[in-house]
Amino acid sequence: MEITVFYDYICPFSFIGSRRIQQIGAEYGIEVEWKGYQIHPEYPTQGKKRRQTFRAIRTAESLQSVMEEEEIKFKLPGFVTNSRLCLEAAEFSKTKGKFIEFHNLCYESYFLERKNIGDQDIVLAIGDKVGIDSDELEFNLKSGEMAGILESYRVEAEKIEVLGVPTVIFNDFRVHGVQSVETYRSIIAKFSN
């Protein structure tokens, strides 16, 4: 069984889905391949005020109940940001064997601490917390080395019609949006038979 996840750090559904997929991966001993997919490349790195539309309020309310199920004290940031630097740093963290720690801390920094993960200083601090040398990470981010990997993920996502994040692929079976742990288990059971 192969599991691939397309995710973005500014998507609260990716945050929830990530936790659930990590649980499933651990439960079944399946290594998960994580692929960063930037859903809003047009957003500025300094952030953009989150609009308070009826839809946004309803989404926040439904997220709140799901977060409570996950026992997360969730608070939707009042802004949205550009996740590119954080996604590039996540790719770099893979080369250091620190991906899951970095990945989880990116979500926590944005959704629990309301930090701007589009800001390079924040990204470097996250790296430092998980044991990645700040100077090395900064050099890598400035080099743009990981941008090519993200671009290859984007091309792949468009080719296989990833419509949003999270998108979880079990072998060749694609699931859009966050699902319950039970749903993920039933998908794995289906492919195990």
Locate the predicted segments by residue.
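C-terminal cap of thioredoxin/glutaredoxin-like
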Residues: 2-4, 16-28, 54, 105-193
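Aromatic-flanked redox-active Cys/Sec active sites in thiol-based oxidoreductases
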Residues: 5-10
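Structural alpha/beta surface segment adjacent to cysteine/selenocysteine redox centers
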Residues: 15-113
